Amino acid sequence: TDTNVITHISIKPSKFFSFFKVLVVCRNDIQQVQQNRLKKFDWLWKVLVYGSYLDFIFIKRLKEFTSFKSVINNRKKFVHATGVTFSKNSAIYDVTHWKDRDFINTRAVECFHIDPDKVEKFQMERLGRNRTSMQDIFIAPMLLIRHGLDLEKLIVRSAISYKTAIFKKSLLSVKAYDFKDVDILKNISCFYSSNLMSYLAILTFSSVGIERENAKEFELLNIPYLRLSQDYYNKLESMHHSFLKKKKEPLHKEHDIATIQSEISKECKKINEEILQLINIDTIERDLIDYALNISLPMIRMNSVNNIMRKYKALRDSYIFSKIELGDQVLEEYAQVYIDYFARSFNRNEKRFIVEVHYSSQIIGMFFKVIDQDLFSKEIITVDTNTNLITLVTKLSTQHITDQLFVQKDIRGFEKDFFYIFKPNEKRLWHKAIAYLDVNEFDDAILKAGRNEI
């Protein structure tokens, strides 16, 4: 029924599985959702895999923006479809009249440019699908979009073709009939290369991080349409062409190549920042994007490694599973979330809310206390208690579900004058995005305890 509550458990890559063939589920990977939510928001199941209810709220807000699909649905201005199909068994359509036209290889399409070395002359005489009723998609100008995402950044690769050309169905074409509407295609191409695009791919694209890094047509079109303030596309297209030209020079200098790459990176940062400003992003939403890019994305890349030895190495060297060093900014940022939230309630009547960080190389604990104003020195105090915390390792155990499945437990609780949390020393567990979830859980517990006392 619609009111049925579903428990969703997400299994992620971990050192335990790679080294011991044991599945370990973290606390935040177990979530509950009412069934009617999954019916109403068909992308929510993907949020349950890589996100939380905070991501759901953020994405729901993004869905309220005008979509790219709604912009190009005006058939007088745009037409969109995928290209032709090569098929030996059902090649029934005569296309000899297309012979010697430009044929754009799918791999020619990269962010902001089409590699001219991967454009050749069309030589096929018959096809399995020739798009007879939609041949305008081959007439310039058109935005060509690859279904396969960039595996490094999980962004969508797209570029505008100013030349009429043939291409396969692995490319989606959005053709603008009026040249002035090319600006719309440029805006979309810029969005496709952004951090927000990567975030949406991880949190809403059904195949990404699950099966393979591919996007379906409806996913590529159901993204926010944002009008940028300047023509970033032309600048980046020019930079990429300069980069390709420079690389072809037999005696090119690596310094020149690096300079162009640096300029491309700077321009992309400008796009990212303007996009975030256009959606009026807040601090929590920025941290959710950061978590997706710096925790979930490396996890997805790691999962795509097929060679077993390379996977072991990827796990061993991965940032997300690496330990936090004493004094690392990660811990201070995590603790600051608690201070920003609870200090409003506790910093009164000559009292101050502080966080004591107890550090060891295996586990980390935080004690959240309210002290007298005259004892206050600073909000976050770090204590190196490497030897004292070792005894707590046994308490930071796992809940045995089956011989191959365990749930990794945190230690969290309340005492008379403070509350506390202990977790393993892994960077992914102490990210700011996780801090918001932990803070809300503590806040709910405090409110519940207060109601019970009434």
Describe these PLM feature segments.
Residues 159, 170-171, 196-222, 255, ...:
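Glycine-anchored helix-breaking recognition loops at helix->coil/strand junctions
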Residues 28-181:
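Polyanion-binding catalytic cores of nucleic-acid enzymes and NTP/SAM-utilizing transferases
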Residues 16, 122-124, 225:
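Extended accessory and catalytic-adjacent subdomains in large enzymes
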Residues 113-117, 149-167, 186, 190, ...:
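Short, ligand-facing micro-motifs at secondary-structure edges
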Residues 2-38, 42, 213-216:
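A conserved structural/catalytic subdomain of Rossmann-like adenosyl-cofactor enzymes
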Residues 138-150, 171-198, 221, 225-239:
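C-terminal substrate/ligand-recognition segments
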Residues 20-23, 27-28, 38-87, 100, ...:
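Non-catalytic DNA-recognition/assembly elements of restriction-modification systems
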Residues 62, 139, 164-168, 182, ...:
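Conserved structured core elements
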